[in-house]
Curated annotation (Swiss-Prot):
Required for proper function of the glomerular filtration barrier. It is involved in the maintenance of a stable podocyte architecture with interdigitating foot processes connected by specialized cell-cell junctions, known as the slit diaphragm. It is a signaling protein that needs the presence of TEC kinases to fully trans-activate the transcription factor AP-1. The gene is KIRREL1. This is Kin of IRRE-like protein 1. GO terms for cellular component: cell-cell junction; dendritic shaft; perinuclear region of cytoplasm; plasma membrane. One of its GO terms (molecular function) is cell adhesion molecule binding. Residues 1-16 form the signal peptide. The lineage of its organism: Eukaryota, Metazoa, Chordata, Craniata, Vertebrata. Interacts with TJP1/ZO-1 and with NPHS2/podocin (via the C-terminus). Interacts with NPHS1/nephrin (via the Ig-like domains); this interaction is dependent on KIRREL1 glycosylation. Homodimer (via the Ig-like domains). Interacts when tyrosine-phosphorylated with GRB2. The modification Phosphotyrosine is found at Y605, Y606, Y622, Y625, Y724. SMART domains: IG, IGc2. It comes from Homo sapiens. Keywords: Cell membrane, Disease variant, Disulfide bond, Glycoprotein, Immunoglobulin domain, Membrane, Phosphoprotein, Repeat, Signal, Transmembrane, Transmembrane helix. PANTHER family: KIN OF IRRE-LIKE PROTEIN 1, NEPHRIN. It is found in: Cell membrane.
Amino acid sequence: MLSLLVWILTLSDTFSQGTQTRFSQEPADQTVVAGQRAVLPCVLLNYSGIVQWTKDGLALGMGQGLKAWPRYRVVGSADAGQYNLEITDAELSDDASYECQATEAALRSRRAKLTVLIPPEDTRIDGGPVILLQAGTPHNLTCRAFNAKPAATIIWFRDGTQQEGAVASTELLKDGKRETTVSQLLINPTDLDIGRVFTCRSMNEAIPSGKETSIELDVHHPPTVTLSIEPQTVQEGERVVFTCQATANPEILGYRWAKGGFLIEDAHESRYETNVDYSFFTEPVSCEVHNKVGSTNVSTLVNVHFAPRIVVDPKPTTTDIGSDVTLTCVWVGNPPLTLTWTKKDSNMVLSNSNQLLLKSVTQADAGTYTCRAIVPRIGVAEREVPLYVNGPPIISSEAVQYAVRGDGGKVECFIGSTPPPDRIAWAWKENFLEVGTLERYTVERTNSGSGVLSTLTINNVMEADFQTHYNCTAWNSFGPGTAIIQLEEREVLPVGIIAGATIGASILLIFFFIALVFFLYRRRKGSRKDVTLRKLDIKVETVNREPLTMHSDREDDTASVSTATRVMKAIYSSFKDDVDLKQDLRCDTIDTREEYEMKDPTNGYYNVRAHEDRPSSRAVLYADYRAPGPARFDGRPSSRLSHSSGYAQLNTYSRGPASDYGPEPTPPGPAAPAGTDTTSQLSYENYEKFNSHPFPGAAGYPTYRLGYPQAPPSGLERTPYEAYDPIGKYATATRFSYTSQHSDYGQRFQQRMQTHV
């Protein structure tokens, strides 16, 4: 019975649970992007009453259509217990907590949070789309993303490359739900950022791809300048061109040039040209370019090669014994110079730096030091600096001095050390004297820039003065200094010997100059003589052809005149400077003569009869056939081209007009030997200079030539000069005078040359 009761109770409880109202599906939290559709589910079991939705505790209404909320409605099948809330075009106002209620069953669902996401309304970079900046001035690029829910995240890009280091901040709007994000990116613009594009991208959950905006930079900057030199390395005094290349934004307004800080007035272009000196190595040349933003100044030094120049001159130094001394000497030169310190009259190098350090100096260190700078292949310069070392007096006079017996003598005591002596005293024999006169002795003191000189003057030097030692003692603040000086006698030569030697030397010098002039004259004269023909070994014999009747006593081989002439021209054609061929035309009564004078260029090498005797006259004269007439002396000097070397000699005639009487001609002397030389004279064409000794043409004198008489007159009467031997007497002694037997009176004078190889 009891068990049956338990079964009945259990069954009744199960039945009651099967018919109870409950939520089979409740609304849950949901997120939606603004503008999208959202559905909040609500499903009830075993309920057929009224269902309503609340928003943040506010009832939205009953039924499926919610007239107060046009975008809201309850959807689903009521028979199936579906009371879902649908929200279309979600807005920020829809962002709330929702609850489904079964009022008759007194049931409430759990609250569901609907979150509405809102993308940034706008993304903007302050100052865009083009931002003008100053180069070198830091600037913050600012990007703003407005009214986003949740707050937007901002990313920066520079020409597509993401940038780090931006700083972001958010600002909550008054609705308490949306936020504005501000991001700042710090940049330091340069002229290279001109045209650079910066992009700001903002994003949140509502728009994961994000929104972008970009700006472009326009950077104003002072001119960017490059200064160049051409050539880069020059010698002092050469020309250099400076070129100033510049870029700027905005445009360049002008150029200015300066050297060593001083403006160059006449330079206003981008190019400056000048001659450089050593100062361009130490004083820079600057180019300044300016625009509206500012100016840029660029400087440069020129690599000028120049000789050493002093920068710090060494100064004379005075110090005490035992002290340390530093001498300073600074030079500048290019290429880098070599510096040496030496002591005067010594080649030992003491230092190679700008400073010379001398430790614990003594008086021996006193003197002049030389600071020498050497720039290889450019130049050398030096400076001298004296060093004075204070100490006891040092007497630098000669230990032996000289004087002439009977004359005035001097004994000198010189102190060149520092400081100058306070006292100087002389002592000799029993005498002591500082200054003044004592008997024949006088002491004088003289101060000069190099030291102090004390002089002991002796009047009428005697033998005893040469036997005495002279003591010179000087004192200064450092102590005394002493020197012993010996006076010795100087031998003097008599004035007559000196004068005679001087005169003799002068005479010898004069004779030497005369001999030198004569030697040079003879050498110059000899150099103008013979010209050696350096040709083949050819022997040439010149044969004079004359009328047969005038030389009937001579016989020799003959040759064709035309052949000899051609050979002569062929051999002597290259020596036309040494062959003087002249033709004199002279009309005396009825005859016309041709005369030639020629210098033998072979110097007698081809003279095959040089051993024969020759007349003293070098002019070989030939008689021509002419009508009888009054004789006349025809004087002429020997030719300059007449030499003893065997030159061919041809006759010329004087053209001097007849005038007053003169002395009778002298017969020729005996024939001179072959080696005899006579004075060389010029070739003669006109001999008016012989007018001082003319012979009249109508005075009864026949015409004569030097050395040979004229043919007798037609009357066979001898003239006053017939005492001379016939012309044939000298025919064999005349050089190259070999007359053909076949010649006649009607033929003109010709020469014939025989050549032997």
